[in-house]
């Protein structure tokens, strides 16, 4: 940790189509080997499909899906007197977004549909309806935190 002042996180440019910083971050999470234009086309195709399916604005549907995947608590390992406890801690807002995006992308990559755009659209569609692998991941994390609530006093 720096002794003098905290480092401000870098500002990322909003995405060109919707002007959303959240969507630009999501594109960066999806991007592989620096191929941003490919990641953008995948995300935009997925959002078009999602908008047609849900009859909502693409950005609204995306934010709704992300909201359903964001975790509020997680567990962190804490070593106390020779034994390791899983201590539930609240998740910072920036990490909340990052985890939600990462889980959506991981779940989409594991799906068996034809194109990545279709997989992503299906995962976002499922997430907006509170089902799918990404939502299940969030529920698992919340369940772990709930099960280890007794160790909450070990927070640091």
Curated annotation (Swiss-Prot):
Entry's Gene Ontology cellular component terms: small ribosomal subunit
rRNA-binding among keywords: yes
Quaternary structure and interacting proteins, as annotated: Part of the 30S ribosomal subunit. Contacts proteins S9 and S11.
CDD domains xref list: uS7_Bacteria (cd14869)
Regions crossing the membrane: none
Biological process, per Gene Ontology: translation
SUPFAM superfamilies on file: Ribosomal protein S7
Main function: One of the primary rRNA binding proteins, it binds directly to 16S rRNA where it nucleates assembly of the head domain of the 30S subunit. Is located at the subunit interface close to the decoding center, probably blocks exit of the E-site tRNA.
Molecular-function GO term, any one: tRNA binding
UniProt record similarity statement: Belongs to the universal ribosomal protein uS7 family.
Gene: rpsG
Cross-referenced Pfam families: Ribosomal_S7
Protein name: Small ribosomal subunit protein uS7
Keywords: Ribonucleoprotein, Ribosomal protein, RNA-binding, rRNA-binding, tRNA-binding
């Amino acid at each position: 940790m720096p002794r003098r002042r905290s480092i401000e996180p870098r500002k990322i440019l909003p995405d060109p189509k919707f002007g959303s910083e959240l969507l630009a971050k999501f594109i960066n999470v999806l991007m592989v080997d620096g191929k941003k234009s490919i990641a953008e086309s995948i995300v935009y195709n997925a959002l078009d499909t999602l908008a047609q399916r849900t009859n909502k604005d693409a950005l609204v549907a995306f934010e709704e899906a992300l909201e359903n995947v964001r975790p509020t608590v997680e567990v962190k390992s804490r070593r106390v007197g020779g034994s390791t406890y899983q201590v539930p801690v609240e998740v910072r807002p920036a990490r909340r977004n990052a985890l939600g995006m990462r889980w959506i992308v991981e779940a989409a990559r594991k799906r068996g549909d034809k194109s990545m755009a279709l997989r992503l659209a299906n995962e976002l569609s499922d997430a907006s309806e509170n089902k799918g692998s990404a939502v299940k991941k969030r529920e698992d994390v919340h369940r772990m935190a709930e099960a280890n609530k007794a160790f909450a006093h070990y927070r640091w």
